Amino acid sequence: MKKYIIALLIFSSSIAQAQQTPRQIGEYDDWVVYTYKENNHNVCYMASTPKRDEGKYTKRGDIYIVITHRPGEKSFDVFNVVAGYDYKKDSKVTAKIGKEIFSNFFTDKDKAWTMSETDDRALIKAMMRGERMIIEGQSARGTKTKDTYSLKGFTRAYKTINAKCGKK
């Protein structure tokens, strides 16, 4: 059920026109893969929710990460975190995979993205090698959070979105 909610949340937060409802095309351990049509082009994405979320918060929305391919826009490997709260202005978001730390993110409300395609590719490469990823952030109220994601099934899910959306 939680995975279905992710599909609906991602779909409802998209602002593109002429979309279909996302269709699940695979589930690989802790990762789920979806596709839909947007302006007559395939969009493929994979999503996961944290295995553990930590922080001294009283209320928090849905938390998940997404990797998206939009071949119609020549956009691939877009990494996105949805924190379940609005980020504090100018706060730092970090992703840690093993000993590698990625901190080149920008935020907008409850979402964070890497700063560049190069950062996306480096992060995804590390995710393919890793076992887990820890995302740390700070809410607009100053609450620090730490979310732990499993990377089990990540590589198979990633290969699926690559094949479905024509990324070589």
How should each PLM-predicted stretch be described?
Residues 19-168:
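A generic "folded-domain core" signal
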Residues 1-4, 31:
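Positively charged n-region of N-terminal signal peptides that target proteins for export
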Residues 1, 16-18:
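...the same signal can extend to comparable exposed beta-sheet modules
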Residues 4-14:
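Sec-dependent N-terminal signal peptides
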